């Protein structure tokens, strides 16, 4: 079983007691997909609760369907935007799910909950006596620390020292411990090394929830993110043959699982995995540092279904930083309004893009150009977080590169967006996919204790990946039984 659902009755009973004392109810996957099924009593509490409040009721806001407000919102449709063609420069329509309206301002709170909730409901994590460790390149440890705080668990957040100031400042208010590891976004091995060190020091007193290897992360995005995109496609009335592509950065491998769900429904759909050009691990077995915060690198996540990936897009981190300035600097906004002709609403929507979301958009643009898609075609991507997470980067960029002018805005719009090329975009053959898959060996078998046999199962066993989605229903049964005891 790829997700441990064995029950430890003694620890489970303690977790029930903790949740009963704190009045904590756990949402099911069904409720995260369709929050209209959330009890009225919960909805009443949410109406009086801020989106980021450290209040257990906010567990029920782990959904793509939150009302897009910061205070007291209810539920509605899926939060998404269409990226204007004046920006993409391509014929097909490109849509993006919006992560800003999750608690913590990023969808990673979903993956962390999906890892933590089954462990609580089965007793594989002791909320009373153990610390939850959240290794991350940014948003995952924020989500983990937040969910831990909601559930009254002690937490340890681990992330690279060069991540944005906003991440560290917020974590200090929520996490029990914050550990900065050496390096930047792509220094994932250093995070793993710190986990091994903590495991040796603290042993049974901690549980490490590693997003790069836990299939609960894959399951959440397959089930919740994939369902959200399907719902939007239905609302838009897109013909099946015109659902052409899904683009997401590799990161932990989680968001790519939504593409697997889409491909199960639309078998012709192409999935593009994005990464930084400055660290082209998938494209060239390469390495290096980069500035696209939140997408990791230098390894292939254990939970990445590489055999189902059709394309690799390596994105220049300078393009991402330039476009972030275009969307957020006064000169950029003026140019977009007066020269490009975007409406006030379209310009406001650009604030929904964080740096990794911009990278995802560029992968979708490369994909559209590579496959010569037309006006009837549709692609989907993800805005993991929003611009609010990176405002201090603007001052840093001003200092490094000088003030952003309208001339710079024109250069970025023309170059990084309208003339984004298909260079560093690779359509994968069978053996190129296998080459990428085999890179897992060096991280996961040699360093992290996985087996050669399971690595081969991921590639050759047709039931391996298909066994994961049905586990959502099994976890829901465990959560419902747990909640029943909490409410008894």
For each feature predicted by the language model, list its residue ranges.
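PLP-dependent amino-acid enzyme catalytic core
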Residues: 1-488
């Amino acid at each position: 079983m790829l997700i441990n659902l064995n029950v430890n009755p003694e620890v489970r009973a303690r977790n029930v007691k903790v949740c009963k004392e704190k009045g904590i109810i756990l949402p099911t996957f069904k409720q995260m997909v369709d929050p209209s099924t959330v009890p009225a009593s919960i909805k009443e509490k949410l109406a009086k609760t801020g989106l980021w409040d450290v209040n257990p009721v906010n567990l029920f806001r782990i959904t793509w369907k939150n009302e897009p407000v910061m205070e007291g919102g209810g539920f509605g449709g899926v939060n998404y935007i269409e990226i204007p063609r004046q920006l993409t420069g391509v014929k097909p329509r490109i849509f993006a799910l919006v992560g800003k309206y999750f608690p913590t301002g990023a969808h990673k709170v979903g993956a962390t909950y999906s890892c933590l909730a089954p462990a609580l409901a089965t007793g594989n994590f002791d909320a009373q006596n153990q610390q939850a460790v959240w290794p991350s390149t940014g948003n995952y440890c924020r989500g983990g620390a937040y969910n831990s705080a909601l559930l009254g668990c002690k937490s340890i957040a681990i992330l690279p020292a060069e991540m944005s100031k906003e991440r560290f400042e917020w974590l200090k208010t929520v996490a029990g411990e914050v550990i900065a590891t050496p390096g930047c976004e792509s220094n994932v091995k250093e995070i793993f090394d710190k986990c091994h060190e903590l495991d040796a020091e603290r042993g049974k007193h901690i549980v490490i929830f590693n997003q790069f290897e836990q299939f609960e992360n894959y399951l959440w995005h397959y089930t919740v993110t994939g369902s959200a995109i399907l719902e939007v496609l239905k609302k838009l009335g897109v013909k099946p043959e015109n659902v052409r592509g899904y683009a997401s950065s590799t990161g932990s491998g989680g968001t790519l699982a939504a593409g697997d769900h889409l491909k199960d429904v639309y078998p012709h759909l192409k999935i593009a995995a994005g990464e930084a050009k400055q660290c082209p691990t998938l494209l060239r077995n390469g390495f290096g540092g980069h500035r696209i915060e939140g997408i990791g690198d230098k390894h292939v996540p254990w939970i990445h279904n590489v055999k189902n990936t059709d394309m690799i897009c390596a994105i220049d981190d300078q393009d991402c930083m330039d476009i972030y300035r275009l969307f957020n600097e006064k000169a950029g906004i003026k140019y977009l309004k007066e020269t490009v002709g975007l409406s006030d609403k379209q310009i406001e929507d650009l604030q929904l893009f964080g740096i990794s979301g911009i990278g995802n958009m560029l992968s979708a643009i490369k994909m559209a150009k590579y496959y010569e898609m037309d006006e009837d075609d549709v692609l989907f991507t993800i805005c993991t977080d929003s611009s609010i997470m990176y405002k201090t980067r603007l001052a840093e960029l001003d200092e490094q590169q000088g003030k952003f002018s309208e001339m710079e805005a024109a250069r970025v719009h023309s170059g990084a967006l309208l003339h984004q090329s298909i260079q560093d975009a690779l359509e994968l053959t069978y053996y190129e996919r296998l080459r990428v898959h085999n890179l897992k060996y060096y991280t996961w078998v040699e360093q992290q204790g996985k087996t050669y046999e399971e690595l081969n199962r991921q590639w050759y066993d047709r039931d391996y990946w298909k066994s994961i989605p049905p586990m959502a229903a099994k976890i829901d049964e465990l959560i419902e039984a747990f909640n029943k005891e909490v409410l008894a």
